[in-house]
Amino acid sequence: MKGLLSLSVLPVLAYASPMIVDSIHQNAAPILSSTNAKDIPDSYIVVFKKGVTSTSALAHQNWVQDIHTSVESKRMKKRNQFTFKNEAFDGLKHTFDFAGGFLGYSGHFDEEVIEQVRRHPDVEYIERDSEVHTLKAATENGAPWGLARISHRDKLNFGTFNKYIYASQGGEGVDAYVIDTGTNIDHVDFEGRASWGKTIPQGDDDVDGNGHGTHCSGTIAGKKYGVAKKANVYAVKVLRTSGSGTMSDVVKGVQWAAESHLKSVAEAKKGNRKGFKGSVANMSLGGGKSVTLDRVVDQAVAVGMHFAVAAGNDNADACNYSPAGSKNSITVGASTLADERAYFSNFGKCTDIFAPGLNIQSTWIGSKHAVNTISGTSMASPHICGLLAYFLSLQPASDSAFAVAEITPAEMKENMISIASKDLLSDIPSDTPNLLAWNGGGSDDYKKIIGGARENDTTEFSSTLTEKLEKLAEEGLTAIYNELKDAVVA
């Protein structure tokens, strides 16, 4: 089998260890599948090689649909001639043309069709479509505490557990795309700032029939429950009422959100989006490992979207799941009120930061006033998405006289990690960053938040060193104490 795989796919497979090549043939694109996902029978995502143009991709898609129609016509004739059950195939489902960086399509194809597709010279690889779902959470009674936690450095106590300190303009001018089950956009906590963006599953209604997406939206931008209380919310429905969906629908949802963001950027440059400060996105969902989903999320980040994704609730390595394993998003684990890693939270080197995720109260479905308290990394990720919106809103607008260079997603990720509260959480594995999200303690000066956090790190180091020196003195090691103290002063 050596030498049969596309060289461009080999690094991807090395990175995505839970992916397997379950079908290899000479001069044919590999068919990939995840070891920890439930495949959808005869459903595939086809990805084109780099260099394939949009025109060539369209011609290919027309070609494959013609093949599908021909094969289905033959199948129908056989079904009419013989009395046996014969499955029908739907053909082309979604097409992907994402900012020039990702081209492909998905569909429901007969094996005869997919074998012809994989031998086409423009195809890099084919991935079996798989199920995606909300990250299951337990429902319990409780009160919100997550907002208070991200605005305090120290562990919460009776005087601080319900006090959220924040800049009042947090989220203003920022669009938040919630890629989930939808959002109860009429909920009073959104104050009219929530809109329906797009429903991806075919035949589904423009409504959140599950509640999961509404809960995430409330944590991001609700008046009472939100981190960034003035952000705009756009519902991107990729999961059905059951909380489940397909990987291809999620990929299409990410593409739609990124395209919407790029339209807003273009409108802002024309002067038609006054005060626009950028876009963030949240994905509190997961399935198995998907090279395609991770790649598409990274492409969305590359065009300027700030992405937060849930690490997952399997108490396992986040790198083995998607989109948790995407390189350029911020992957979020869940913490508790007692500053512990939540027992369900995934971990590992792909986890970038932790945020409150146990017993989080937020908006819900059923009425304009409904609330619910649930748990999961699904609840932690919206805290980070909200913080992304919050920090973006502290920048001057692009059309302002005080406009500054746009903060890239990579810079924002680095800054958020650099100011996080360090080494406060217990039960954190050695390969996992011990970082808890922090909002700057209510300051509305982003530069001071970033600079002040770094100064605090130096101060904390000096304070710790002084304490150790004092201990030496107490033990009677006066000479050593004086020598070291003089060195510190110098």
UniProtKB/Swiss-Prot annotation:
One of its GO terms (biological process) is proteolysis. The keyword DNA repair does not apply. Keywords: Glycoprotein, Hydrolase, Protease, Secreted, Serine protease, Signal, Virulence, Zymogen. It is an enzyme of class 3 (hydrolase). The keyword Glycoprotein applies. Its EC number is 3.4.21.-. GO terms for cellular component: extracellular region. Residues 43-134 form the Inhibitor I9 domain. Residues 27-134 form a propeptide. Glycans are attached at residues 282, 456. Residues 1-26 form the signal peptide. Secreted subtilisin-like serine protease with keratinolytic activity that contributes to pathogenicity. This is Subtilisin-like protease 8. It comes from Trichophyton verrucosum (strain HKI 0517).
